[in-house]
Amino acid sequence: MDLVQRAREQYSAGRMHDALEAAQAACDRAPKDAEAWWLLGRISRHVGLAAASDDAFRRASALTRSRPVPYRVSAGRFQQLVQEARESLPPAARRRLEKVTLRVQALPSVDDVRGGVEPDALTARSRGPHEVLTVFQVNHENRSGSETALRTLVARSLSRR
């Protein structure tokens, strides 16, 4: 099995340390593979290796223009972007979110991933007596190369709910 594929499978199953080893091996074996570096960046974030993650994302971005370096913001700034996006939604979308508690979390937990949440999910909704929509900051940042792109993606994520 291809190392990148193995890393993806481990990552999706919530076996982050196994995924990290496979992704590192894939990058060692094919140092010009932008997808391997991008995957290593995502996995490294999940295991708490922010500096290694940033380095992997920079390497991936240097290999392909289709992957800009993720735009990072503080937790407070991201919360502000979520609030601004919520307030700017069309009336119908705002009404859909009125009874929903919005929660910001850095990433899905390993337990969330093992329970079926995609590790790269932008949001997760838990239904019940009190509906909660969790917005994952890092996964939004990973797909955004600027604050404008981040703002747009957050608004799009909220409007889909």
Report the location of each language-model feature.
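Active-site scaffold of zinc-dependent metalloenzymes
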Residues: 119-160
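Canonical positions in the second alpha-helix
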Residues: 25-26, 60
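TPR/TPR-like (Sel1-like) alpha-helical repeat modules
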Residues: 42-69
